Structure formats: structure tokens, C-alpha cells
Amino acid sequence: MSEHVYNLVKKHHSVRKFKNKPLSEDVVKKLVEAGQSASTSSFLQAYSIIGIDDEKIKENLREVSGQPYVVENGYLFVFVIDYYRHHLVDQHAETDMENTYGSTEGLLVGAIDAALVAENIAVTAEDMGYGIVFLGSLRNDVERVREILDLPDYVFPVFGMAVGEPADDENGAAKPRLPFDHVFHHNKYHADKETQYAQMADYDQTISEYYDQRTNGNRKETWSQQIEMFLGNKARLDMLEQLQKSGLIQR
């Protein structure tokens, strides 16, 4: 049994520094086709992919993201929940379909579809020798992103992905993930607090040692400290409002 795919995904890490080499149209097409082969709930295909090589558009999106690799990459993808085409079908339907695609369930379906497509693209790109980094930072200003990309109603930007050849001095590495026994629950969820705390304490030590080694002692924070800092920062609190402005979560 080949373990090629297993070994490939186990090596995954975010690449944030790329060579100045644009992806060819053929490569972009293959990546998108690989993405389209992902599973999709009820065959709704409630997503679209926006490919961006226009430097001005990239720069505008960089201002939203704050990350240089939004511009400095081989190619930029933006993944959106897309019910615009379903809305067009709805205009000639005998039933009110908006009750479904404008619901919270509709949001979940579209977001999951987009994520599955993106992961297919990520794995395919890495198999081709490219590096990738996901860009949730495009949600820093959803209204601006919708304006930049001319997104119609019922279309919502979920995240981006920068793709390209890793720079020669790119030295990223896979971060240790949560322990297998902490994320895999056999038959039912195991919520025993003592076990959970013990597993997280071990993981905190692993992450602290990882950062200490990677940064020559400049970073030593634990995973729990990172989570406290991130989740304690009340960011993007307008998301429900922005979703509703897009025509989603109406009920």
C-alpha cells in the first residue's frame, strides 16, 4: 500500500515566502479542477473560486489582510460561499428556495464546500512542489473585499490562499499537532476534565519546546497561551452583520 499521500500531508506547513514565479494557466486550471473534484453536499456546489493575478487587486487585498504574501506569491485564490447561481435558479422556481440557501444550514453547507475544495487544491499544489498559505485575514474587512472583488448578493468571501514556489530561504516546518488521543474519540466524546487538562498540559510543553528550538529561545509560549491571546481578542465581531448583508443567515 502506497503511503505517498499520507507522507505528503504529514509534511504540510504554511509557506509565507515565495519565489517571484507566476503559476502558469495550465497549473491554475489543474488546481481548480482538482478542487472541483471534492465532495459537495447534495451536489449543491455552493462555492466559487476567484483567481487573482492582477497586482492592483492583490495590493488592495493586502491592505485588508496586512500580509505581504497576499501580493508576493505565484498566484492568489479567494474562496467564496456562492448561492448567486442558486438565486438565479430560484427566480424561475415554483418554490421559495431562499428559505434554504438563506438559512444557517445554507451557510454551513457553503462554508464546508469551500473548505473541501480549498484543501483539495492545497494538497494538489503541494504534490506539484508548490507551497501554500491560507488567508483568513481577508475577513478583516469583508465589506471591502466584497467591493474589491465585485461580489454580488448571496456571495461571501471565506478565505484566501496564496500559492507559489517556496523561496530558497523559506524554512518553515510542520508544527506538532494536538495528540492523537486528544482529538480522536472512540465511539463517543470523552469529556473527562482531568484527562483533557493532562493532555493539554503535555501538548503545551511540546509546543513551548518547539518554539524555543525554532527561535533559539526567543519564543516559548504554550498552545494554551496562544489560544487565550487569540480568542481573548474580540476581532471581527461584525461577521453576522456582514453575512446578512450578503443575503445569508436570513433565518
Q: Which residues make up each language-model segment?
A:
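Acidic, surface-exposed loops and disordered segments
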Residues: M1-R251
